[in-house]
């Protein structure tokens, strides 16, 4: 059983609120979950304290048990200083594709 800490959408249409939950990765996004750890309200200003509310003791306990935070939750945990988020590395991003490389060579010759 792969356990993840992720966001489950709640709220009404065009007014989202997200619950931070611990769930099995096979469960639906807004469906069954094991435990609710807090909430996130993206409509509030970034400097508002009520924008993100987490029970840090529960979060630390679940991370210690091996729960993997989703990308967005890992950003929250990094900002709170709970778990360091490793930077993404994509060395192939700057390499031009074959078609672009051929076009550049043709333009250089022509």
Swiss-Prot record:
Region feature Disordered, mapped onto this chain: 79-110
GO biological process, one term: translation
Claim: Methyltransferase is one of the keywords in the record: no
Keyword Ribosomal protein: yes
Domain of life of the source: Bacteria
Pfam families, per the entry: Ribosomal_S16
Keywords of this entry: Ribonucleoprotein, Ribosomal protein
Record's GO cellular component terms: cytoplasm; small ribosomal subunit
MF-aspect GO terms: structural constituent of ribosome
HAMAP family: Ribosomal_bS16
Family label: Belongs to the bacterial ribosomal protein bS16 family.
Annotated protein name in UniProt: Small ribosomal subunit protein bS16
Species of origin: Bradyrhizobium diazoefficiens (strain JCM 10833 / BCRC 13528 / IAM 13628 / NBRC 14792 / USDA 110)
